[in-house]
From Swiss-Prot:
<keyword id="KW-0694">RNA-binding</keyword>
<comment type="similarity">
    <text>Belongs to the universal ribosomal protein uL6 family.</text>
</comment>
<protein>
    <recommendedName>
        <fullName>Large ribosomal subunit protein uL6</fullName>
    </recommendedName>
</protein>
<keyword id="KW-0699">rRNA-binding</keyword>
<dbReference type="InterPro" id="IPR000702">
    <property type="entry name" value="Ribosomal_uL6-like"/>
</dbReference>
<dbReference type="GO" id="GO:0003735">
    <property type="term" value="F:structural constituent of ribosome"/>
</dbReference>
<dbReference type="GO" id="GO:0019843">
    <property type="term" value="F:rRNA binding"/>
</dbReference>
<dbReference type="InterPro" id="IPR002358">
    <property type="entry name" value="Ribosomal_uL6_CS"/>
</dbReference>
<keyword id="KW-0687">Ribonucleoprotein</keyword>
<comment type="function">
    <text>This protein binds to the 23S rRNA, and is important in its secondary structure. It is located near the subunit interface in the base of the L7/L12 stalk, and near the tRNA binding site of the peptidyltransferase center.</text>
</comment>
<dbReference type="InterPro" id="IPR019906">
    <property type="entry name" value="Ribosomal_uL6_bac-type"/>
</dbReference>
<dbReference type="GO" id="GO:0002181">
    <property type="term" value="P:cytoplasmic translation"/>
</dbReference>
<keyword id="KW-0689">Ribosomal protein</keyword>
<dbReference type="Pfam" id="PF00347">
    <property type="entry name" value="Ribosomal_L6"/>
</dbReference>
<dbReference type="InterPro" id="IPR020040">
    <property type="entry name" value="Ribosomal_uL6_a/b-dom"/>
</dbReference>
<comment type="subunit">
    <text>Part of the 50S ribosomal subunit.</text>
</comment>
<dbReference type="InterPro" id="IPR036789">
    <property type="entry name" value="Ribosomal_uL6-like_a/b-dom_sf"/>
</dbReference>
């Protein structure tokens, strides 16, 4: 059995779990997420805990039970608490402005960048150089943050660009004469 799958997922109060024929549906105050069921993994729901067991002793079934447990754990946390990613813009003239589901970025290019948020992700800009992304799906929030960072990744000489809050950018030394 997978080491990850050995620990059951505790379902907090206010989170509803439904078993369908093809998917596990998790509902909470932040929305609803579904997880497609895999034939190698059996899911048991007892006393507010979700347990994941491999249907057979193959390597793939063990791996899938651990993967399923990790994904469902993130879904339970997402619908109850939500996920947040913070980005900061470092550089002269680098600006961000949120207007509903649209993020306008000025990153030193000759044109502004207009990024439309996907379903389930909301954006806020507390200041012109800070972006806060929130949502219930961890994968989608992380993907959006990575796409925004990719517009102007931090460069190694001055550190200018879009970076995650707390990210350490390894700086290079300038060429010596």
């Amino acid at each position: 059995m997978s080491r990850v799958a050995k620990n059951p997922v505790t379902v907090p109060a206010g989170v509803e779990v439904k078993f369908g024929t093809e998917a596990l549906v998790i509902k909470g105050k932040n929305g609803e997420l579904s997880f497609p069921l895999h034939s190698d993994v059996a899911i048991e729901f007892n006393d507010g805990k979700l347990a994941f067991v491999a249907n057979n002793s193959s390597k793939q079934a063990n791996a899938m039970s651990g993967t399923a447990r990790a994904l469902v754990s993130n879904m339970v946390k997402g619908v109850s608490e939500g996920f947040e990613k913070r980005l900061q813009l470092i550089g002269v003239g680098y600006r961000a402005q949120a207007q509903g589901k649209i993020l306008n970025l000025s990153l030193g290019f000759s044109h502004p960048i207009v990024y439309e948020m996907p379903e389930g992700v909301s954006v806020q800009t507390p200041s012109q150089t800070e972006i806060v992304l929130t949502g219930s799906d961890k994968q989608v929030v992380g993907q959006v943050a990575a796409e925004i960072r990719a517009f102007r990744a931090p460069e190694p000489y001055k550190g200018k660009g879009v970076r995650y809050v707390g990210e350490v950018v390894v700086m290079k030394e300038a060429k010596k004469k």
